[in-house]
């Protein structure tokens, strides 16, 4: 999979990290959205058009699309807070991944607003890095040990 993503990684359109034992594909706001918007840019659509089939090829794997913002408040009619903005962005990305071949029953969306910064929000650069979409490859629960044999301790 990393080989398939290499050109997008090399061009700065996405990064891949391991977070809490999960592979996370990170897409910066600058590639996907205009500031304060959940409408995907043309470049973002192109990146997702390339990424969707790669994710779809991972048979049986599930993905969580997480929307993240910086700590600067937003107060618009459509987005009363960063929670709504981050959720709308995650949903828009998830819906487009479905259009590009990822089965809808393998995608979930989550809004994180400004609760999981990767950089300090004290600088413009840090805030820019915190405005992102993360696509986390969920662990395959069928590969986890069977815990049904354990009885509740009472």
Where are these regions (language model features)?
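Short, basic/glycine-rich phosphate-binding loops at helix/coil junctions
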Residues: 25-31
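Extracellular/lumenal/periplasmic "stalk" regions immediately C-terminal to a signal peptide or transmembrane helix
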Residues: 1-19, 24
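Periplasmic OmpA-like peptidoglycan-binding domain that tethers envelope proteins to the cell wall
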Residues: 32-45, 50, 68-148, 153-154
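Short phosphate-binding/catalytic loops that engage adenosine nucleotides
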Residues: 58-60, 102
């Amino acid at each position: 999979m990393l080989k398939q993503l290499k050109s997008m990684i090399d061009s700065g359109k996405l990064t891949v990290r391991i977070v809490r034992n999960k592979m996370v594909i990170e897409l910066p706001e600058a590639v996907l959205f205009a500031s304060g918007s959940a409408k995907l840019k043309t470049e973002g659509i192109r990146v997702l058009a390339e990424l969707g089939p790669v994710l779809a090829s991972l048979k049986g794997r599930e993905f969580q699309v997480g929307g993240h913002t910086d700590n600067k408040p937003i107060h618009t009619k459509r987005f009363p807070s960063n929670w709504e903005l981050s959720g709308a962005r995650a949903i828009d990305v998830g819906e487009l991944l479905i259009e590009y071949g990822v089965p809808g029953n393998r995608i979930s969306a989550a809004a994180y607003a400004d609760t999981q910064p990767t950089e300090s929000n004290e600088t413009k650069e840090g805030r820019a890095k915190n405005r992102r979409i993360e696509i986390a490859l969920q662990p395959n629960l069928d590969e986890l040990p069977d815990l049904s044999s354990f009885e509740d301790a009472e």
